[in-house]
């Protein structure tokens, strides 16, 4: 009975999450202000995170939103779970899709667990190859993370400086986060991570490399986790949110986002929170690229859940405004909306297929197929502005020129404003107003603009997906098909593309070491 009660311990609530945030030290800079987590400009992002807590005990969502920890056997939030099977991957993808519907965009809690899944693979394989003890350290960290149902941010993207130079070649060595000292009790790091989502209202952030590191880049090979209010950490934050409404409330109006520069001003990281350190041990350097791409891989898999949701949100708005404009039956409208729906289904199918073609890593973590995740993410990124264009086309210019809310609820001009907003006679003017105001928020607001850029670059731009796909695809074997058909080769062996994962990055480092020895 005690064991059952222990395993069924109540999960963290949104209210507990908010109370924990309020206890954190103020280190969030909005402009020149230093603010705490109770600043109202951060509420929109917290409201999105709320959706990841509120549905774990609801029959409709529980199976998707919870999992059983492979380490403790406890029921945990799926945003804290390490994928152990194809089913886990599929449930994560479906969970992401349905929760994104509820918030009108990014659910903002995937980055942390995507980085933890990557670390569960890399730390184990490093230990096996180098005799390090990172995996046991990681498991202890993970158990605490799961027990407390923590929200994590992932800090991957560096400032990068001169884009044509490698980390060790930069004029300013701090343009990539680096270890400046390794001690018995930990390390000191200096640098900055940029374009980081949700950090001001996360419990912890997980730092990982943003790229492949060569033999000369040892100082930049580092991964660790810290609380978001850690000593020496400064969060330069740009919150995004919708204009508050005095007269018309709607769930979507309460959502928001925060993007951050995380500055590490000679920050001490305790030993038990370090998962990779090339400065202390150059033999660990090959694992920087492996980890960087493994996280990107999991995050692109996540995008195969969230981007279909985003497309469906845009298609939903396009269908509604077409009805309210009285043009829903027009063939050109049907054709345009079918394009959005088709992209949504194809991207989701790429994610599903990558889960179906997944493989188990030596640590037991399930890894989706890399080419399929990148194909899905690239398709989404290449089409996001086309989808917004379709919504804009069907909506008309009113989404950018709609008078302010007060005009529609003014005693003097309100009735006139509603009169001239009328379109489909079967639809109440208030609903038409809500529709156009909602699409205005989607397309021309601060947060709407952010989501459009995130649709291209979040998780990696289409160019990065292209590079990854071409690195992994065996193009020489692919040529054999044409060689046979054109009579250049007399035989054709059966061609089936094998499943691939980011493990190939280790081979890239090995080749770099051989080149270095020759010179």
Regions found by a protein language model. Give the residues of each.
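Acidic/polar, glycine-rich intrinsically disordered N-terminal extensions of enzymes
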Residues: 6-69
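Glycine-rich flavin
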Residues: 67-204, 210-224, 229, 234
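Generic structural signal for well-ordered, non-transmembrane alpha-helical segments
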Residues: 43, 47-50, 143-146, 309-312, ...
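Alpha-helix capping/hinge segments and adjacent helical runs
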Residues: 371-514
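A structural signal for well-ordered alpha-helices, especially hydrophobic packing surfaces
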Residues: 50-53, 322, 344, 348-351, ...
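FAD-binding core of flavoproteins
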Residues: 159-303, 473-512
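Short, charged, amphipathic alpha-helical segments
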Residues: 334-338, 366-374
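Extended amphipathic alpha-helical segments enriched in small hydrophobics
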Residues: 302-360
